[in-house]
Amino acid sequence: GSEMCIRDRHQAWCYDFVSEWIVGENRQDLVEILRNVEEELILRKRFKQVPLDDLVGTEVFPCVNECILTQIMTEISNHIINVDMIINTVEKRRTLAWYDDVECYYEGILQVAKMQAFFLEHSAGFHTVEARNIWKEYTEDYYRMDTYYRHYHLAFGKSLTVGNDHLDDLFKQVTDKVEGLYTHWFLGELGNNWSDACADELAQYGRILLVPQQVDFYNQKVKNEDNRVFVIISDAFRYEVAASLAEQLRRETQSKVSLGSCAGIFPTVTKFGMAALLPHKQLSINERSNGDLQILADGMSTDAGNRDKVLKATNSNSVALKYKDIAPMRRAERSALVKGMDVVYIYHDKVDEASHTSDSMVFPACDDAIEEIKNIVRIIRNEFSGTRVYITADHGFLYTYSPLSEDSKVDKTCLLYTSPSPRDRTRS
């Protein structure tokens, strides 16, 4: 080993020298040197023979990370997922050399470990009888699986731009296992349980009993507030992303943050959900001459350009704004828009907008949406002196990397001509 070539009195200096080089401006020069040494001494092949426990604390050579990841990914591909080992390995490697170069791969296997832990907790499957209890379980526990899956695909998507010849094919094999665990086990079994449990209540009442309804949002949350109310409506901002936002707001703002849910109106598309969040006594549907559907609140159009009017019909001191309009404004301009207002609706569109570009952009857009909504909250608190803020959505979304099978799809005509009724979609 190298310790035989270095005098004892120089070991500390040599260690500091290499450590500073690793994090210094010329680190890329060191990478080239180390890669040459790896090839010359066939270190990759040698390290593959070393037990994982002995490699975890080893740094300096970049190929150590690749050897560790290769072993773990190979085991995952062979259905061997040691949850504790993976979590401990990732946490240990975070602080060592060259982690940033392969961070997305480590983050990917970390999410696999979390998904496997969830699977082990619920290996008996989902067999809850009452729909309201499934709802409760999802909003308190099951949503975590959606978060793990989203974070996994954020990491996997990053790997497609970073690239590593030794890891990329293995990562794709791991992705196949993730799809099986999430799409076929989690969505499949939980979806079947939910469909069976809610069928009778939906048929008899058109909603899930004892679950808050989206159509009641304004009357229950906004109408009777004594103080000025701000409502941020983020298009397609689903429940599990809201849970991540809530956690960050608690940590960063030291505010009282609570997370709730409600059943969205059916079908869960923008025009229906946006209408449900506006004040109304009755929602109705008008079919235009071109076949498009228009949603009316007490006879008034709820299209984007008319929402300010709908709000003012209930409370004249109300205003509807768009984040993309107020974001570039000066503080004084923004403040003038909300001066004297009791109810302020701020519409935000990041996730849904991304879905119109590419499905693969939806998960990255969730992180962007979180940051933008935190900025809206900052504006409300610091510039508008707001203390009561609701963050909600018109609908959520369901995304899988692997395409849905034909029997998972619904004929569009079934949606267009079905009377609006509550749907099993949660939101903040």
Identify the function of each model-found stretch.
Residues 1-2, 7-46:
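N-terminal, non-catalytic alpha-helical interaction modules of very large eukaryotic scaffold proteins
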Residues 3-8, 417-427:
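Conserved small/polar residues in nucleotide/adenosyl-binding loops
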Residues 32, 42-189, 193, 263-360:
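His/Asp/Glu-rich, glycine-adjacent segments
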Residues 179-181, 193, 354-389:
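A long, amphipathic alpha-helix that forms part
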Residues 208-263:
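Segments forming glycine/polar-rich beta-alpha architectures that bind adenosine-containing cofactors
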Residues 229-230, 377-407:
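Metal-dependent active-site segment of extracytoplasmic phospho-/sulfohydrolases and closely related
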Residues 245-252, 359-364, 399-413:
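Short secondary-structure boundary/capping segments
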Residues 283-287, 407-419, 423:
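Acidic, Ser/Thr-rich peripheral helices and adjacent loops at domain boundaries
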